């Protein structure tokens, strides 16, 4: 499935050339400046300023400038966001639990993984395996199978591979990111189908992230190095404004690291990886108010997943303690292409639209390099090892997902007296095609091939009266169709479909300036995934005895059963929130921002994997009879309702020379049928961030302390997460306008921490040591970096 390394190098070279192409000659720049002088009188700058003041739908450059001002003030809640209502508003003004991660924060923290960026964001966690560079995002205890809508430059990220890992992840290197918007809960239901947990919207870097005001071209070159173990990064991003109607931007990233040690000093095997990535964007403004952007993003991840045995495995006790897993040399390629057309003019109250077309491909090829025992010669041949679950050493398997989608929306505005009204309406469609290949293993059963189309349309009325009342009402229609196309093992043209209307209503008042309480009710709709619906066939025995023969003739430990009758999950979220926004609180120029939320999300028809009632099974293995109490069938079913409730707080005070912020989450989640806690809940997280700005703000020193409680209310057989206190230190120094030096220490206390619960064993009783051993985060990491800017007019 994957393309060769030559393609990777060629693409990265091309992107690098384009990004460095910003360093054009002085003659070309002079010509472009002359052309700009001819064009500018036709589109004077005062009109742009008027547009920004006239309505929130500002052009992207103005939004970037507004966000830059917010970043300089230290208030991420002053950033512009669109995820909650598809209309531009500052995060602090949104009547929704919205958080923003800025490029300034990313630059300060120098993260090697996305999870490092979300400690101070309430309600958000990441489930990382140390030997897998992809990321699974969890919002308010919901994750997997699309419960959180993840978009990169507007393109849905729906990749999913079932195994000893999260059922849904995505690939994105932090160095590529220009900003992140997070909306928690289904309050952003108009943003897209499936988001009963929330929306995570990632924006990759663009020309306004590199070029400064007045520059026609610019380049940022960055490099960093970290300990534990040889964490290296190099990147270059550059762009040129060819003329006032055309921008060209590109960049390339290379990252590498070796196996890290956890806080206990244990080296975590196969946690090293190599990542190469490149992006390209061309922006054209063919007419006043119109902007068309063509974007391309490519990422190449080379890594090894799986764990070697850590000791002898001669007895059941030693197997439980020391047995690893199969190991696979992995190469994942992620291709994303987008075309976006935006239009907005201040005098046009009828049209303010966005049209987005996108395609996303994840192509993950794996070759088995190690088996945890020497057994399997009957299946694999002399000198080889393996079993019929994971195949034999040297076998290949692959996971391919193609997603294509379109997202169209428009906002029309009208005023009636003191009532200011904005009607936003549109539709979105995406299609997933999954193709799984496994030469002798079980992956094509556990992650079946298939196709799914999900579509929806919405209308929203956002109305404001005077300066003290805001009401938002919305209605979304969702529809899905899913089929196996005859490709799933043991399934012949299984299909399912469904649809639903989901409402949203929000009411907010501002009785006094700066104080805005609000209440909200919103529903979200998540269609069943391909794997949940189509999984079918026998779970191979791994060389041991077989207990049951399935309908398709395969035999194994048990049979997976498809379920075309699965109903979609429906999230029903109740929210009470307060936004606080004050300036000049204690001293002139200081600012205080805060968002508080109380919520309860009732998820109806929650989908989970259910085992049949155990029965006695007689079997014969190697000529010896035996009897076992076995669950012969497993199937995804609508067996429970989930109730998740909690409190979130995000506060930030900035006095200019110093700043302090606290992000907190306290929540609980239950399967209401069994009254057992959900394994994906993180009960408590409090993160305090503070710092000072010295030397005329050239030097910033910041510390972050995350205090996290363990999740112990779990289904039977789960290994709890650990409680921990993670302390990080960051320093940024700008000796000149064009040079920025960064230093940091992650996990300065060198704590051992395992941030999420995992199953203690699989359904067949074998260990999940590969997941357990790779769950701990790195121990102490020292790191430093430099960014150099070049640019000119």
Regions of interest found by a model, annotated:
Residues 285-287, 420-422, 428, 448-601, ...:
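Structural signature of Gram-negative outer-membrane beta-barrels, strongest in the C-terminal barrel
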Residues 225-256, 266-306, 331-342, 417, ...:
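Transmembrane beta-barrel wall of Gram-negative outer-membrane proteins
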Residues 273-423, 427, 590-592:
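Outer-membrane beta-barrel domain signature, strongest for Gram-negative TonB-dependent receptors
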Residues 159-164, 175-179, 184, 189-265, ...:
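Outer-membrane beta-barrel translocator/receptor signature
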């Amino acid at each position: 499935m994957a393309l060769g390394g030559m393609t990777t190098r060629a693409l990265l070279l091309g992107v690098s050339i384009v990004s460095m192409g910003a360093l054009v000659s002085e003659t070309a720049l002079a010509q472009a400046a002359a052309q700009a002088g001819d064009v500018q009188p036709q589109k004077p700058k005062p009109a742009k300023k008027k547009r920004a003041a006239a309505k929130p739908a500002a052009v992207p450059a103005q939004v970037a400038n507004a966000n830059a001002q917010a970043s300089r003030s230290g208030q991420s809640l002053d950033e512009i966001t669109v995820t909650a209502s598809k209309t531009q508003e500052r995060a602090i003004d949104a009547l929704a639990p919205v958080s923003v991660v800025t490029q300034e924060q990313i630059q300060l923290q120098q993260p090697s993984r996305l999870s490092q960026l979300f400690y101070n964001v309430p309600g958000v966690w990441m489930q990382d395996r140390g030997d897998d560079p992809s990321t699974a995002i969890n919002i308010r205890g919901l994750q997997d199978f699309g419960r959180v809508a993840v978009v990169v430059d507007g393109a849905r990220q729906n990749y999913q591979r079932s195994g000893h890992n999260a059922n849904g992840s995505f690939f994105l290197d932090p160095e590529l990111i220009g900003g992140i918007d997070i909306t928690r809960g289904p309050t952003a239901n108009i943003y897209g189908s499936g988001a009963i947990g929330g929306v995570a919207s990632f924006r990759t870097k663009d020309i306004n992230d590199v070029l400064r005001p007045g520059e026609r071209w610019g380049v940022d070159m960055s490099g960093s190095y970290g300990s534990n173990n040889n964490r290296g990064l190099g990147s270059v991003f550059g762009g040129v404004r060819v003329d006032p109607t055309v921008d060209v931007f590109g960049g390339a990233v290379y990252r590498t690291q070796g196996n890290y040690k956890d806080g206990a000093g244990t080296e975590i095997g196969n946690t090293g990886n190599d990542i190469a990535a490149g992006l390209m964007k061309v922006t054209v403004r063919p007419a006043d108010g119109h902007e068309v952007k063509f974007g391309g993003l490519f990422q190449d991840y080379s890594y090894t997943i799986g764990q070697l045995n850590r000791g002898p495995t001669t007895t059941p006790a030693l197997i439980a303690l020391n047995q690893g897993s199969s190991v696979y040399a992995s190469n994942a390629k992620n291709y994303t292409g987008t075309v976006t057309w935006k239009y907005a003019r201040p005098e046009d109250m009828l049209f303010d639209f966005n049209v987005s077309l996108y395609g996303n491909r994840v192509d993950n090829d794996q070759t088995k390099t190690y088996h945890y025992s020497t057994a399997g010669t009957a299946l694999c041949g002399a000198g080889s090892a393996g079993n019929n679950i994971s195949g034999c050493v040297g076998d290949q398997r692959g996971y391919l997902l193609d997603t294509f989608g379109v997202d169209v929306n428009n906002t029309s505005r009208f005023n009636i007296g003191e009532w200011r009204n904005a009607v936003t309406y549109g539709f979105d469609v995406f299609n997933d095609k999954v193709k799984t290949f496994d030469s002798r293993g079980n992956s094509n059963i556990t992650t079946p091939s298939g196709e799914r189309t999900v579509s929806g349309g919405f209308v929203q009325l956002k109305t404001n009266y005077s300066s003290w009342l805001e009401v938002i009402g919305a209605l979304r229609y969702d529809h899905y169709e899913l089929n196996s196309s005859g490709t799933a093992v043991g399934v012949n043209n299984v299909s399912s479909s469904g649809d639903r209307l989901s409402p949203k209503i929000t009411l907010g008042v501002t009785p006094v300036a700066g104080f805005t309480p609000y209440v909200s009710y919103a529903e979200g709709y998540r269609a069943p995934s391909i794997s949940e619906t189509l999984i079918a066939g026998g779970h191979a025995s791994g060389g041991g005895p077989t207990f049951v023969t399935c309908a398709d003739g395969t035999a194994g430990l048990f049979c997976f059963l498809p379920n075309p009758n699965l109903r979609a999950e429906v999230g029903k979220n109740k929210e009470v929130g307060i936004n606080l926004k004050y300036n000049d609180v204690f001293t002139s120029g200081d600012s205080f921002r805060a968002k508080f939320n109380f919520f309860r999300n009732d998820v109806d028809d929650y989908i989970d994997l259910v085992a049949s009632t155990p029965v006695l099974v007689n079997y014969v293995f190697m000529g010896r009879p035996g009897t076992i109490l076995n669950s012969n069938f497993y199937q995804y079913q609508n067996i429970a309702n989930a109730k998740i409730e909690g409190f979130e707080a995000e506060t930030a005070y900035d006095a200019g020379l110093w700043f302090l912020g606290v992000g907190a989450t306290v929540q609980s989640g239950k399967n209401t049928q069994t009254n057992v806690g959900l394994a994906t809940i993180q009960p408590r997280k409090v993160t305090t961030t503070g710092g000072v700005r010295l030397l005329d703000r050239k030097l910033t020193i910041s510390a972050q302390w995350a205090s996290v409680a363990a999740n112990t209310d779990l289904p039977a057989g789960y290994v709890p997460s650990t409680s921990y206190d993670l302390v990080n230190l960051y320093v940024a120094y700008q000796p000149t306008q064009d040079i920025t030096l960064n230093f940091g220490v992650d996990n300065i206390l060198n704590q051992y921490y395992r941030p999420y619960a995992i199953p203690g064993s699989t359904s067949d009783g074998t260990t999940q040591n590969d997941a357990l051993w790779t769950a701990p985060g790195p121990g102490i990491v020292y790191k430093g970096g430099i960014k150099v800017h070049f640019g000119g007019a």
